[in-house]
Amino acid sequence: MSRATALLLVIVIGAVAAFAWTRWTSDEAAVERRLHGLAAEVNESTIDGAGLRARSAQLGTYFTDDVVIDLGKGAAAIRGRATVMDMASRLQPRTSAFTLQLTDIGVVLAPDRLSGSVVLTAEFTRRGGGENAIDARELSLAVTKADGAWRISRLTVVEAFK
């Protein structure tokens, strides 16, 4: 291998490593990792009372105090982290038959890099009964960064074409 080829190889490897490092450590990647963490928490299951309270508290860390969840179709908006946590603790035993996977995540941050918007597809798969059933929904999220963590401040179900 000639010296020029070796130098070119080192430059290419360095550029790829720099790109990968920048991508992994970017705020956009941090938002994506945080959302995948939320999905992993949702997919965990527990059945005892203390475990349900602990899980709902952990799920609450992914939302701002004043989060608004708009499910559309005339449903009343869900307001506040405390409400989300209460609902999560009561629904957990019934949601254990489902898994959540987030795909097609697109993150756009505001110039201040402390807020942004996310569009993604949430795929809910019902396990058991012989055949899995999948329900996919497009979601639009507003996210904010506080105390070093990205949290959801608004979640809206995007209506599909009719």
Predicted regions and their residues:
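Ser/Thr/Pro/Gly-rich low-complexity linker/stalk segments immediately outside membranes or between
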Residues: 23-39
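Short, cysteine-centered beta-strand-loop-beta hairpins and adjacent loop/turn segments enriched
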Residues: 93-97, 123-135
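Short, well-ordered alpha-helical segments enriched in acidic and aromatic residues
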Residues: 34, 47-72
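A solvent-exposed, acidic/Ser-Thr-rich amphipathic alpha-helical stretch
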Residues: 65-106
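A short hydrophobic beta-strand element
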Residues: 112-124
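Short beta-strand edge/turn micro-motifs at domain boundaries
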Residues: 2-5, 24, 115-117, 131-162
